[in-house]
Structures are given as structure tokens and as C-alpha cells.
Amino acid sequence: MIPLGLSRFGVIVRVHRLYSDQPLEPGSPARLEGRSAHYLGRVLRVAVGDNVVLFNGDGQDYACTVEQIRKDTVALDVRSRLPAKPESPLRITVVQAVSRGERMDLTLQKCTELGAAAFQPVWSERVEVRLQGEKLERRLQHWQGVVVAACEQSGRAVVPGVLAPVKLDEWAARPTGGTRLLLWPDAETSLAGAEFPGTVSLLVGP
């Protein structure tokens, strides 16, 4: 969901929406650096005076105006808070067995768009991917980036967290609260007839 607004020429345009992990407050300045600044200034080619929407995961959207564009930074003025897309009252943690490459990315993307509150990757018996150390840290950063991008595109103002992977039996031994669900083709209870509390953990294979 991309909001609409007026350009500096009075033409209706799509307003770009970006994540920024800084405090945002109406009447205060904001600054984008690095990849965000490059994407906004060089890829999207916004100009001074253009409108942009920022969010930082606090559940709010913020209407901003571009004040200055430099090679590595973009300065903005935070004007006001905007109504954000409401979050689901059902808090779902997706417990996903780590899968290869694009399959894991697709799971994170689509579950974020559908309203998942958090992700807990797990190592199960059939998992083919095993990561440790710096490789695992880079993969976690990549996964979190996939989630952020899905929030930018879907209009969510709360960013689900991606936790560090644990072994499946370790997760199963932890007290998580709420209800734990495992989808099974031969189960006698269907999702349509089930009642859930406010917190659910959904385990997905392989």
C-alpha cells in the first residue's frame, strides 16, 4: 500500500514510504544515510520539496518533506503523524524451519504482509542449511531486511523481529505462552473451527 499525495507541481503522485530506525517526531528533522539515502535520492530521484512517508516500527507513519539532498544523505522535515494500518489483535509467531534461499525469503515476505508478529527460525532434522558465526549474522540481517521491505510495501508500521535460529527441540522445551499450532494433513481439528487466545505460535516444516 503506497499513499498518494500532491507533487510540488500539484499533480497526484505516489508517495514513497521508507523505514528508518531513528526517532521520529513532528516538527523535528530526520536524516537518511547510506543505502536509504542512495535509494531515495539516486534510484527514486526525489527532489527538494517532495513528500515522503517514514516509519520506524513504533506503529505510526510520519509525513515528511525533503529539505536537502546530498551525495550520501537526505535531510527531511517531519511534519505530522499519519493513520497507520491497524495490527491484528492475534499475535502470531511463525516458527519456520530454515529453508534455502528464496523459499525462506518468500515465507518471511508473505507472512509479514499477512500480519505475522515475529519469526523464530528453527533447525529441524530435515533442514539442509546450517549456518554459524558471521554467515549466520549476515543471513539474519538479510532476513530482517526482507521483513522491512515487506512492511514498506504492505503499509505495516510495526516491524516483526526475526530471532536467531535455535534447534527445534530447544524451542519446544521453552515456555512460550499462548497456543502452539502444527499444521498436519490428517489432523481432526480444522483451523476454521478452532478458537485462539491473543498469542499463537505456528510451526512450519520441513
Where are these regions (language model features)?
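N-terminal positively charged helical leader segments and presequences
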Residues: 1-83, 134
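Solvent-exposed alpha-helices and their adjacent loops that cap or buttress functional pockets
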Residues: 24, 44, 86-87, 173-175, ...
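RNA substrate-binding interface of SAM-dependent RNA methyltransferases
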Residues: 79, 84-182
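A glycine-rich beta-strand to alpha-helix segment
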Residues: 194-206
